[in-house]
Swiss-Prot record:
Keywords: Lipid metabolism
The UniProt record lists the keyword Lipid metabolism: yes
Function of the molecule: Positive regulator of phosphatidylinositol 4,5-bisphosphate turnover and negatively regulates signaling through the cell integrity pathway. Involved in rDNA silencing.
Protein's recorded name: Increased rDNA silencing protein 4
Lineage: Eukaryota, Fungi, Dikarya, Ascomycota, Pezizomycotina
Domain EH, residue spans: 327-435
One of the Pfam families matching this protein, by short name: EH
Length: 435
């Protein structure tokens, strides 16, 4: 969009420019005369001589003027310097850390005076003419007549706004190796060669510093922390607490069974032994069937005799009754397995008389006293009680027991173990039950 320019503004700007050009031309001529007067000093003495520091610290020593600029007069043409002279001037300026161009006064130049001093053939004059035209047009548009503002417009280009450094996102572990390999492939000296000429290398340097300082540190930290968090997460996922057991409710005996069958599909109950199952069944039977809640019964105390060989036999509770058929069959099986043991021992003894052998054959259905004592002593009854039982059942003093005597003696031992006392005589009903 073009801004319209009035005639008054245009004439005012032209008058200001002419006034500035006249003043700038006079200043340049004075400077040239001063430089030509100082150029009579030899170059070597001017460049390598050490001047004493001035007493006033605000006044600094003026640097030497090269002969090319000292011989400059109004209307002369600038000769292009060769490559060797430029290198020499650059080295001379770097050794003293002073740039020769920086000592010229910052005064605005007009197009007319510039063409009088610098020829139109030189490249520097053409460039300055283009910049002056640009600043003049800019001053006309905005109505600015400040020569210092015009000088700053062509002296240095406007700096670009700096980029805000944003923290790059943390790359994953897989991209860490690729980022490090790219950083290793970059050549740091190559990034600083052309910083004055182009801005691309400056951006590369900024990105490299960002990656090396913030992104690389964050990536390395994340790569070390990710496996530990993954391992912790996996461990926490595997270990889950067991579900709490359902609360036990007291009610009818059928209700817990139904509840147990319904919950079995959800949670597998622990395996119960036969004793625990029997105990639970007894507890359910003991529970009241009515809705009224009664105080729980105390647990039953089971007492055991610490000395099993000592039996408490009540004297008043005398054995009475008869031998049951099931008990009789059990006792007869024991007799059948142990009868006639003494006969075999007598027959194989060569020192025994033949009469004794014939008599032993008649005792084939008898059980020897040694065998009887061995069998009855396994009941852990006292020897005195066993002797009383032997006297009650043994009719013939031959040291052996018949079938009926052995069965009745076994029955009396069981009665003593049950807590009954021994009678003075065995009842006739008992003898009849074993015949």
């Amino acid at each position: 969009m073009k801004i319209p320019v009035t005639a008054d503004a245009e004439s005012a700007s032209k008058d200001g420019l002419q006034h500035d050009d006249i003043r700038a031309t006079a200043t340049v001529r004075d400077r040239i005369k001063q430089f030509s007067a100082e150029a009579s000093i030899p170059l070597e003495k001017a460049s390598f001589s050490r001047q004493a520091p001035s007493q006033n610290p605000s006044i600094t020593a003026k640097p030497p003027i090269p002969p090319q600029r000292a011989a400059l007069k109004p209307g002369t043409k600038l000769v292009k310097a060769t490559g060797t002279e430029l290198c020499g001037n650059q080295q001379h300026g770097r050794s003293r850390n002073i740039s020769p161009i920086a000592h010229f006064p910052a005064v605005p130049l007009s197009n007319k005076n510039t063409s009088a001093i610098l020829s139109s053939d030189s490249e520097t004059g053409a460039e300055l003419a283009d910049r002056r035209e640009f600043t003049a047009s800019k001053a006309v548009r905005h109505g600015s007549r400040d020569p210092h503002a015009e000088m700053s417009s062509w002296k240095s280009p406007t700096p670009l706004p700096q980029r805000k450094k944003e923290a790059p996102p943390v790359p994953p572990r897989s991209s860490q190796l690729s980022t490090e390999s790219e950083l290793l492939q970059l050549d740091p000296p190559s990034l600083h060669t052309d910083q004055e000429g182009s801005g691309v290398n400056h951006t590369l340097e900024v990105r490299e510093s960002d990656i090396s300082d913030s992104a690389l540190a964050d990536a390395m930290t994340a790569s070390y922390l990710i496996p530990s968090h993954a391992a912790l997460g996996s461990k926490r996922g595997l270990k889950q607490p067991p579900p709490p057991p359902p609360p036990r409710q007291r009610g009818s005996p059928s209700q817990p069974l139904l509840q147990l069958s319904s919950d079995s599909s959800k949670v597998n109950p622990p395996a119960l032994g036969p004793d625990e199952i029997l105990k639970r069944g007894m507890d359910m039977l003991d529970e009241p069937k009515s809705g009224s809640e009664l105080p729980p019964k105390p647990p039953r105390r089971v007492t055991f005799n610490p000395n099993p060989e000592v039996f408490q036999i009540e004297s008043g509770n005398v054995v009475q009754g008869q031998v049951i058929s099931s008990e009789r069959k059990r006792y007869e099986e024991v007799w059948e397995a142990n009868r006639g043991v003494a006969r075999f021992g007598v027959m194989h003894d060569p020192n025994v008389d033949q009469k004794v052998i014939r008599k032993s054959l008649a005792y084939e259905d008898l059980v020897v006293d040694l065998v009887v004592r061995d069998i009855w002593s396994r009941s852990r009854l006292p020897q005195a009680e066993l002797a009383k039982i032997w006297k009650l059942v043994s009719h013939d003093a031959v040291g052996m027991l018949s079938r009926e005597e052995f069965v009745v003696g076994m029955w009396l031992i069981d009665q003593c173990l049950k807590g009954h006392g021994l009678p003075t005589n065995v009842p006739k009903s008992v003898w009849k039950s074993v015949q």
